[in-house]
From Swiss-Prot:
GO cellular component terms listed in the entry, alphabetical order: cytoplasm
Stated role: Catalyzes the ATP-dependent 2-thiolation of cytidine in position 32 of tRNA, to form 2-thiocytidine (s(2)C32). The sulfur atoms are provided by the cysteine/cysteine desulfurase (IscS) system.
Entry coiled-coil feature ranges: none
UniProt organism field: Brucella melitensis biotype 1 (strain ATCC 23456 / CCUG 17765 / NCTC 10094 / 16M)
Major subcellular location class: cytoplasm
Gene: ttcA
Record-given protein name: tRNA-cytidine(32) 2-sulfurtransferase
Length: 293
């Protein structure tokens, strides 16, 4: 048992668990999965210094497996006394056709989770401005972001918490590499342009497969992500397929890639803004030529 797992066990509440977890499968497999996800979530929170005791976090809930998992894991940590912040679950209903409006309020109320459901018909704005053949995701996400910032301020929240996981980060990295000509991924911690709100991604280390298994075991009432009829762009789908193929042929590569994003060596890249190549001069001292040849 490592330090994270030991702390999780030690801090378990005497009443057992958050109401969300009272009817979960009593299997070794689920317990291992839950413990792994809790550990990785807590590790990301600690690695990137997300917690300021007494803060109020706005947890964005779309109804997909990732955001449900995020909310459940944060509630689990808070129940154990390992996350000293307030949590507010927020869903932004963007007016997509056939959106089942009752699912999230019913779920959140049933488990006594503080929440806010906000209706803003951004779907009509998107469909009015873009042709039917376009992918709506980019404009839709910009409109959603603006509304989420507004809601966070209205609710006195210090941070917006999103459910992006390991695969989201890697896909974004390769999209930027192949199509943007830059080395960049999704930051686990970000300060917004106005400087008044943080954006956190506590699932940065969590695997999508684990989150899917977790959602199935927890029997979350999943809302499909294709209600608007638009799908993510071809570029992201291609990156997802590439990563699946790499992991299939060389198991464990996704974990290696995530570790690589935490182990950057600017002197071994070509960005003159990150390393002073012009000021690098021989002075008779030994340098490091690892991997240079």
């Amino acid at each position: 048992m490592n330090a994270f797992d030991a702390d999780i066990t030690e801090h378990a509440d005497s009443s057992g668990c958050h109401p969300l977890f009272r009817d979960v499968p009593a299997t070794v497999e689920f317990n291992k999965l839950r413990k792994r996800l809790v550990r990785l979530t807590r590790q990301a929170i600690e690695d990137f210094a997300m917690v300021k005791p007494g803060d109020r976090w706005m947890v964005c809930l779309s109804g997909g497996k990732d955001s449900y998992g995020l909310l459940a894991l944060l509630l689990d940590l808070k129940w154990r006394g390992l996350l000293p912040v307030e949590l507010l679950a927020v869903n932004l209903d963007q007016g997509q056709p056939n959106f089942p409006k009752h699912i999230l309020p019913d779920f959140l109320t049933r488990y006594g989770i503080e929440h806010r459901i906000e209706y803003q018909d951004t779907y009509s704005i998107v469909t009015d401005k873009l042709p039917e053949t376009s992918t709506y995701c980019s404009l839709c996400s910009r409109l959603r972001r603006g509304n989420l910032y507004r809601i966070a301020r209205e609710e006195g929240c210090s941070a917006i918490v999103l459910g992006h996981h390991r695969e989201d980060i890697l896909e974004t990295f390769f999209m930027n590499l192949f199509h943007g000509g830059r080395l960049a991924a999704m930051p686990p911690k970000l300060l917004n342009d106005e400087g008044d709100l943080m954006v956190f991604r506590p699932l940065a280390y969590a695997a999508e497969d684990d989150l899917e298994k977790f959602a199935n075991a927890m029997q979350f009432p999943i809302i499909p992500c294709d209600l608007c009829g638009s799908q993510d762009g071809l570029q992201r789908n291609a990156m997802k397929a590439m990563l699946i193929d790499i992991e299939k042929r060389m198991p464990g590569r996704k974990d290696t890639m995530i570790r690589a994003l935490t182990n950057v060596r600017p002197s071994h890249l070509l960005d003159r803004k990150l390393f002073d190549f012009a000021g690098l001069m021989a002075n008779g001292e030994k340098g490091s030529d690892d991997a240079l040849w």
